[in-house]
């Protein structure tokens, strides 16, 4: 997996290593006449002389040698298992001495993205390890890392290894946005990368990651291309995946995409189904299905196997809508849903109401408490499926209530503070008055004692 930068330490001059690698390729090929050594020998001779004279190597000659070596390197995948990694490491070392290594790395990545016949059990692990070495020998800002990462993800998809994908996920989570920015990927390249990750995630059984990156890929489609066949296919894939995914209940990222909006004209039944799952209930869904059976929504009949899952999801969403409406009511039945109301809305027996409520709670759509004694569901919290003008008005109303409550609290605090100040001032004034009175009482007797002395002195 991609990790901190790696340096390959391989001793030998370019001509020596190139000749050694050509001989190894010939040993794998077992050719009858023309060999790689024969082809590169005339090119290596002047390079060898330049190395001996310690002069600047002819870069064009070196690139010509590398072209022949890389072209013949397709045979490396047939090498014995223990020799594959050292052989590719040598090739990577040679390619790094090219005037433009990127022109060779993409071809090497394509070789590694193919199966390794000599190691059917560990071939994918070997390819990922070698590709990771290539990735980590490149500078973090080198856009060639994009092609290497694509190859790594392709190998994981082909192997279907959940362990390999799980090992890559932390790097993708932490680095993918930065990589996209650093490599300056355009919309098409970003879309290729997200779709490759989505395919690998799906092959590894990680449906959440697959759905996330399909939506990310969808968001890279510019408005001008929203009606193109490729955009239509991606929008249908994203929408089908979201509708059938057991944990996806928020369709806002999809409805905001231009390519999905374009389905309104190209795939009207599918878009209508999206609108039902976005804001409507089981009643609207059943009316829609009666007019447009599931198998007729898409030309390839992709939704037919998921008919039961679709009905389950719309029931959960219907209950979420009921709960959200209950939170806005007032009176004795505020925030309360009777079993009878729920059973009627979901078209299920009352005996199954608790099961559906529990499933909706598990889905994170509502929170509350079931009362078997009173046959009701007390709603504590509910998810709004659509947050529009009505919901903003409700938020404004609640904020006004909280504001008035806070103003009342502030008024009480202000009154208490003023009362405390008044009482403190009164207490201080009373204490001062008591002090003055005490001073007068203490001063009177002393003056009376001094009076006879003053009279005697006067006499």
UniProtKB/Swiss-Prot annotation:
One of its GO terms (biological process) is cytoplasmic translational initiation. GO terms for cellular component: eukaryotic 43S preinitiation complex; eukaryotic 48S preinitiation complex; eukaryotic translation initiation factor 3 complex; eukaryotic translation initiation factor 3 complex, eIF3m. It is found in: Cytoplasm. One of its GO terms (molecular function) is translation initiation factor activity. PROSITE patterns: PCI. Coiled coil: none annotated. SMART domains: PINT. Residues 207-384 form the PCI domain. Keywords: Cytoplasm, Initiation factor, Protein biosynthesis. InterPro entries: COPS7/eIF3m, eIF3m, eIF3m_C_helix, PCI_dom. Pfam families: eIF3m_C_helix, PCI. Residues 434-452 have a biased composition (Basic and acidic residues). Residues 431-459 are annotated as: Disordered. Its main location: cytoplasm. Component of the eukaryotic translation initiation factor 3 (eIF-3) complex, which is involved in protein synthesis of a specialized repertoire of mRNAs and, together with other initiation factors, stimulates binding of mRNA and methionyl-tRNAi to the 40S ribosome. The eIF-3 complex specifically targets and initiates translation of a subset of mRNAs involved in cell proliferation. Belongs to the eIF-3 subunit M family. PANTHER family: COP9 SIGNALOSOME COMPLEX SUBUNIT 7/DENDRITIC CELL PROTEIN GA17, EUKARYOTIC TRANSLATION INITIATION FACTOR 3 SUBUNIT M. Component of the eukaryotic translation initiation factor 3 (eIF-3) complex. This is Eukaryotic translation initiation factor 3 subunit M.
């Amino acid at each position: 997996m991609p990790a901190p930068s790696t340096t390959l330490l391989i001793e030998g001059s370019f001509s020596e290593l190139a000749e050694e690698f050509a001989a190894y390729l010939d040993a794998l090929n077992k050719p009858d006449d023309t060999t790689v050594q024969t082809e590169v020998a005339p090119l290596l001779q002047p390079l060898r002389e330049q190395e001996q004279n310690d002069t600047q190597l002819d870069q064009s000659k070196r690139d010509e040698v590398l072209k022949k070596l890389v072209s013949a390197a397709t045979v490396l995948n047939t090498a014995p298992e223990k020799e594959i990694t050292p052989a590719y490491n040598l090739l990577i070392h040679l390619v790094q001495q090219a005037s433009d290594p990127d022109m060779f790395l993409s071809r090497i990545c394509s070789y590694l993205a193919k199966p390794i016949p000599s190691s059917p059990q560990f071939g994918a692990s070997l390819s990922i390890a070698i590709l990771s070495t290539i990735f980590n020998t490149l500078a973090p800002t080198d856009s060639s890392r994009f092609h290497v990462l694509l190859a790594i993800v392709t190998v994981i998809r082909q192997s279907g290894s959940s362990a390999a994908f799980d090992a890559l996920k932390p790097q993708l989570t932490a680095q993918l946005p930065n990589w996209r920015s650093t490599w300056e990927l355009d919309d098409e390249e970003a879309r290729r990368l997200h779709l490759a990750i989505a395919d690998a995630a799906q092959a590894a059984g990680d449906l959440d990651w697959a759905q996330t990156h399909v939506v990310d890929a969808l968001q890279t489609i510019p408005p001008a291309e929203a009606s193109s066949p490729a955009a239509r296919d991606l929008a249908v894939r994203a929408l089908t995946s979201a509708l059938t995914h057991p944990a996806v209940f928020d369709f806002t990222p999809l409805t905001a995409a231009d390519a999905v909006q374009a389905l309104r004209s190209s795939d009207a039944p599918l878009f209508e189904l999206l609108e039902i799952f976005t804001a409507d209930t089981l009643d609207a869904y059943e009316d829609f299905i009666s007019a447009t059976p599931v198998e007729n929504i898409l030309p390839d009949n992709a939704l037919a196997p998921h008919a039961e899952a679709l009905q389950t999801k719309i029931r959960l969403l219907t209950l979420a809508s009921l709960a959200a409406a209950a939170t806005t009511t007032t009176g004795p039945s505020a925030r309360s849903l009777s079993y009878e109301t729920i059973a009627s809305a979901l078209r299920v027996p009352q005996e199954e109401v608790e099961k559906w409520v529990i499933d909706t709670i598990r889905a994170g759509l509502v929170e509350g408490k079931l009362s078997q004694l009173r046959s009701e569901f007390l709603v504590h919290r509910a998810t709004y499926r659509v947050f529009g003008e009505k919901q903003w008005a409700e938020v404004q109303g609640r904020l006004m209530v909280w504001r008035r409550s806070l103003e009342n609290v502030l008024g009480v605090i202000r009154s208490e503070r003023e009362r405390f100040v008044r009482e403190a001032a009164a207490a201080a004034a009373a204490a001062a008055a008591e002090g003055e009175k005490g001073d007068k009482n203490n001063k009177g007797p002393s003056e009376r004692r001094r009076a006879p002395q003053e009279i005697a002195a006067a006499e």
